[in-house]
Amino acid sequence: MRTLIREDLEAARDRLESLTAPQRLAWAFEHCGDGFALTTSFGIQSSVLLHMLSRLPTGHSVPVIWVDTGYLPPETYQYSEQLMELFDVRLVVAQSSISPARMEALHGRLWETGDVVDLETYHRIRKVEPLEQAMADHGVTCWASGVRSSQTDHRRSMSWLDPIRDRLSLRPLLDWTPRDIYYYMQEHDLPQHPLFEKGYSTVGDWHSSGPDAGELSGRETRFGGLKQECGIHLPQDAVEGLMGDGI
């Protein structure tokens, strides 16, 4: 990421505030060129940002990075095939250098211990490190994701554009509501994730996701209630000590 003085960053945020979500994507590509990428989880709302990207004249040249932990539900893998065919994306699959079986042999089933430190180790191995490696391999300086401010306490503190681990993180949908997502998908006839009809409002790994139930909804259903963020969207100082060498 090029060095930004605070005035540059604030000016960019002010500009992004006045744009629509698709225009924010176009702005990022215009300013970052080949250094721009998009991340996707092929989750409940993923079709929205992929659809917006596909409608940009240069959209098909933008790398779309998907962190495949090896623990996603079968429905997510099926949905990913559907969306890849629909949008013809330039997909980059980011995976850990250690297989799920090897990780479990060395570290156990980290998501079953009820210890947040073990969850952080799991997320570092299976999510954060693979994403950072993929971004480094593709020279990414700015990446867009579909996070929204209403999802978690941490995300309420986000702005349109923030530095994260030596790159810029763009949030085109930051001010969108679940209703905005739903109506956009209806307007453009976008397919729903199969688990949406089973009560899921968010989905990640099979062992750390569940349908909305009772007072629990959204990100509260993730990670056994121990945490709401996997580390991908956290700043450097929040993950120092968890990251591996060279990340």
Predicted regions and their residues:
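Nucleotide-activated chemistry modules centered on ATP-dependent adenylation/adenylyltransferase
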Residues: 1-247
